Amino acid sequence: MVLSLQTLAKKVLAGQRPTKCHPHFLKCYGLWWHNGPMIFDQNQKKIWSPIFTDGVHINAALVKAVAENNYDLIKLFTEWGANIDYSLLSVNTERTRDLCRELGAKEQLKQEEVLYYFNIIKRNLTSSNIILCHEVFSHNPILETINRTKLRGIIYEQLEALMENTDILSELLTKYWYGIAIEFNLTKAIHYFYQRYVHLHQWRLMYALFYNNVCDLHELYAKEKIRMDMDEMLKWACRKNYNYLTIYYCCIVLGADINQAMFHSIQFYNIGNMFFCIDLGANAIEEGKTLALQKDKSFIASLLSINCYSMNDSLSLKETDPEVIKRMLKDYHSKNMSIAHKYYIKHGFNDI
């Protein structure tokens, strides 16, 4: 596409630092969005504005402009290289649909194209983009028209055990975006969801426990005073293997029963967690072996039959700062798992 002189001028101006440009000129050139200057980086193909402080890809910015029925920006972003077909993800009026059609948009997207664009847009793991995705997609009728099984599969990949059996797609998608924000510690997005979805405070606590996010766990429990039954917290921490950070926080910082954490880990067949609990001081080995046999987990029972496990004295049990805990356990290898592994290599477990 050959750009007009005016479009080129806007492109150059949008690439300047806002402090170098007077607001009046930016407004005249249509480079004022969300009550502030808009910046465009043509190399990264990203747009910045007061609500997109991390920047979003120009195709995502187009989706937002279409949702807002901002005709000038729809034209401008298309001239700057945005794919006009992305507009069909959020078009909500006939007038906007006509404009997008004039700019070259298809009549409609196929199911595979909707899912493809959905996956492309959500790849940018920043607060700005995740908030945009939530606002555009969580209550979007276009997602009601596509294959539910495929979409729920995408959501399940993120939520796993935290995915509830509900037919309300908007609720699942809200948790989906919230979960991404928590997993990747997107502070601004987390704050955004926290302020708007009070009923999800405990769900966020479960998510932090399940996904080993000790910083968010500390934020919720120590600062925000969000509470739930301690045994339930242990179950969520032990449900996913190698959740060393949240198991440590629950047992060492909050005082949960380390033997109970070991029992939960056995029930979930999470051997890494089980050995970590022994490293921390769990000593109900015989009870754990009995539980493993009751639950038909014979391999774990065999592991617990080795009478040579002990607490890891080199592991500090005094840390309470989540950042210190993260550093301490970043590359942690379980002492007792190593013992079991060496025993297995030398003797096997057939004769236990």
Curated annotation (Swiss-Prot):
Bilayer-spanning residue ranges: none
Keywords: Early protein, Host cytoplasm, Host-virus interaction, Inhibition of host innate immune response by virus, Inhibition of host interferon signaling pathway by virus, Inhibition of host STAT1 by virus, Inhibition of host STAT2 by virus, Interferon antiviral system evasion, Viral immunoevasion
GO cellular component, one term: host cell cytoplasm
Subcellular localization: Host cytoplasm
Induction and repression of expression: Expressed in the early phase of the viral replicative cycle.
InterPro entries registered for this protein in UniProt: ASFV_MGF360
Signal peptide positions (record): none
GO biological process, one term: symbiont-mediated suppression of host type I interferon-mediated signaling pathway
Principal subcellular localization: host cell
One Pfam family from the record: ASFV_360
Quaternary structure note: Interacts with host STAT1; this interaction mediates STAT1 degradation through apoptosis. Interacts with host STAT2; this interaction mediates STAT2 degradation through the proteasome.
Similarity comment: Belongs to the asfivirus MGF 360 family.
General function of this protein: Plays a role in virus cell tropism, and may be required for efficient virus replication in macrophages.
Protein's UniProt name: Protein MGF 360-9L
Species this protein is from: African swine fever virus (isolate Warthog/Namibia/Wart80/1980) (ASFV)
